[in-house]
């Protein structure tokens, strides 16, 4: 029995069309809260034994074909506000990273590193996303969140355990808002810089394909703060290339010809195709280099039940 809500609560919702890779089976339930109070009430009344999975826009996610045995919480319009207060940029967790970068730039505040990061602010914080030498950890002041028990809390950045492509947020904790400190900049110059970033990204990454961004973490060369070590040249895409896996395929899944660390749905892929190809890449890169790549894309859910 699910608690009453003011938002939308749907049983058995197929998640494929909510992920960038367009794969995935059904969630037991999908909850889209109306606002933070609705989320607090729902989690506070939900049976503690029921798993909860916060989901953003699905830009860095493979949901397995058997679906997800959990309540998936997906924030929407009630959580996408962006406001500027002095040197602080406060963004709802559902606000897109690119929108936050643009709004900040229009106000003369520099969060340009967010412009080409796919996804929403909640996911960016959870993964300590970064680009062009800047990471969320470099700018984040604090977040608002709702715990699995249904308590609204404010957490300083220092308590989030932000490191390279990861954080230590408690399981089931749903981020609702993030506050960043942003340096001043000329709006025209910030806009020009973002245009350059977009051009650079579009010339080197398969932005017109169905992908989930970088597939594997760069294997080394990052400090515990998540800041890049500029003296280290080891990159996942180089290891994949050296193993002869650029363009490798399994079913409808492919390692991009344009950028070999991008796993794409080339047409009709299942989650099993995508995850299976990724695991094959890990195996063959290890055989080639002795280095074991780690997934950057999150994989969740169950394998499909064999009905034969």
From Swiss-Prot:
UniProt-listed InterPro entries: FAD-bd_PCMH (IPR016166), FAD-bd_PCMH-like_sf (IPR036318), FAD-bd_PCMH_sub1 (IPR016167), FAD-bd_PCMH_sub2 (IPR016169), MurB (IPR003170), MurB_C (IPR011601), MurB_C_sf (IPR036635), Oxid_FAD_bind_N (IPR006094)
Question: What UniProt keywords are attached to this protein's entry?
Answer: Cell cycle, Cell division, Cell shape, Cell wall biogenesis/degradation, Cytoplasm, FAD, Flavoprotein, NADP, Oxidoreductase, Peptidoglycan synthesis
Cofactor(s) this protein cannot do without: FAD
Q: List the biased-composition ranges (Polar residues).
A: 212-226
TM regions (residue ranges): none
Which GO molecular-function terms appear in the entry?
FAD binding; UDP-N-acetylmuramate dehydrogenase activity
Cell inner membrane: present as a keyword of the record? no
State which pathway it belongs to. Cell wall biogenesis; peptidoglycan biosynthesis
Provide the E.C. number(s) assigned to this enzyme: 1.3.1.98
Q: Which GO terms describe its cellular component?
A: cytosol
PROSITE patterns attached to this UniProt entry: FAD_PCMH
Return the PANTHER family for the record: UDP-N-ACETYLENOLPYRUVOYLGLUCOSAMINE REDUCTASE (PTHR21071:SF4)
Q: What name is this protein filed under?
A: UDP-N-acetylenolpyruvoylglucosamine reductase
What's the source species for this entry? Answer: Cereibacter sphaeroides (strain ATCC 17029 / ATH 2.4.9)
């Amino acid at each position: 029995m699910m608690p009453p809500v003011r938002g939308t609560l749907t049983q058995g919702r197929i998640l494929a069309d909510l992920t960038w890779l367009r794969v995935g089976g059904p969630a037991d339930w999908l909850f889209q809260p109306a606002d933070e109070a609705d989320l607090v009430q729902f989690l506070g009344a939900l049976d503690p034994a029921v798993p909860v999975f916060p989901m953003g826009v699905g830009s860095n996610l493979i949901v397995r074909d058997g679906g997800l045995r959990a309540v998936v919480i997906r924030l929407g319009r009630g959580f996408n506000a962006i406001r500027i207060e002095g040197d602080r940029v406060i963004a709802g967790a559902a606000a897109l990273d690119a929108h936050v970068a643009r709004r900040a730039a229009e106000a003369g505040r520099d969060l340009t590193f967010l412009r080409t990061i796919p996804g929403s602010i909640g996911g960016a914080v959870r993964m300590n996303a970064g680009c062009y030498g800047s990471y969320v950890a470099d700018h984040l002041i604090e977040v608002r969140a709702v715990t699995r028990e249904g308590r609204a809390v404010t957490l300083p950045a220092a308590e989030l355990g932000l490191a390279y492509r990861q954080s230590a947020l408690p399981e089931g904790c749903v981020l609702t808002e993030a506050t960043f400190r942003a340096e001043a900049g000329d709006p025209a110059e910030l806009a020009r810089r973002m245009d350059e970033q977009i051009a650079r990204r579009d010339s080197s990454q398969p932005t017109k394909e169905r992908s989930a961004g970088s597939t594997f973490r760069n294997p080394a060369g990052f400090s515990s703060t998540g800041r890049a070590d500029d003296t280290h040249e080891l990159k996942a895409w180089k290891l994949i290339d050296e193993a002869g896996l650029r363009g490798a395929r399994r079913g409808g899944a492919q390692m991009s010809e344009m950028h070999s660390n991008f796993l794409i749905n080339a047409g009709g892929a299942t989650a099993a195709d995508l995850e299976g190809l990724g695991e094959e890449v890990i195996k063959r890169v290890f055989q080639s280099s002795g280095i074991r790549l780690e997934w950057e894309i999150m994989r969740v859910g169950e394998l499909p039940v064999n009905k034969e």
